[in-house]
Amino acid sequence: IIVGTGTCGIAAGARESLRVLLDELTARGIDADVAEVGCIGMCYNEPLVDVVTDDGEKSTYGHVKVEDVSKIVKEHVIGGQPIEDLLVPQDGFFDRQVRVVLENCGIIDPESIDEYMSKGGYKALKTALTEMSRQQVIDKITASGLRGRGGAGFPTGVKWGFVAREPGPEK
């Protein structure tokens, strides 16, 4: 069971729904994996709760109120029957989206460095620190086209090149 607890979910009441969910599972003696994830990407449907079955079938519930939680546990988690009137319609919202930077958003716990690393997080940093020279890093950043966010969009690799050529240990 996945509960979106990004700022949008929290503002919509996700923490309360999560608390009631955990209490409900405990009271019924259900040993389910419950994960908190960052924003799932449908802020307008928060709080969002995904129920994923053992065979990988995912049902997404939207606008989950505290009073809906018991019904979701009883009918879906225990009974195996999704509650149609609480499900988020499959309208193709995500179909044409390609997530790059935020590909794991709504999938992993944003407060778990281990989950981030299990998805390849910090791999590029490790490579830069252990396998590349300073100039190779600058060349890679330059080739990427990465630009600053200060308004002018100045090329980051060019800036790093300027700084690297300056004398002295502090940059």
Which residues fall in each region the model found?
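Feature of Fe-S/electron-transfer and energy-metabolism proteins
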Residues: I1-K171
